[in-house]
Amino acid sequence: MKIMMWMIVFITWILAVYAPIQIRGEVKDPTALDDQVENGLNDQILTEYEAFYIYDHIASYLSRPEVGLSGFAKFFRESANEELEHARKFSEFVNKRNSKVVLKNILLASSGVPMDFKNIHEVIDTAIRKELQVTAHINELHKLASQMNDAITQDFLDDFLQEQVNSVSKLREMRARLHLDNSAVYLMDKEFR
């Protein structure tokens, strides 16, 4: 009799807990991305791939025998690989949030990046502009995630924002050092090898 009584209590408890879920339908997934945030993350993936493409283009340019700045080329090849890794991290994040990665076309020709550069100063200025663009986009995405109460995405973006600050600072320091004297280009190129 006691066993029967406990079974009735247990079945009643199960129905009380699980029946409302069935009545109300599917429970909202708190890890799901808002459509606007998902679109913003996909745009950021494109931005990261564009940065990769630009830095790889710069590295190829600097590697030319007539340019001869293999140290700077190495620096920009490493920077390109960093941007590629960022794109992959954003893709993984979108997938983990049960959303879809939508890859878009990379158009270097319409990005305003020259095929050849006048000097290393123009290269550094191009890189700074790109890093500022990447930073601005991540800031906007962070703001959007905040408006959508998406703390998970905000937390994910925080490390990228700090890394952007460091990248821009390093490029600005490089630009300043290059203006010190005529041998700065040679010395910095040697430093990066």
Question: What residue ranges belong to the model's regions?
Answer:
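Iron-associated oxidoreductase/ferritin-like identity signal
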Residues: 2-193
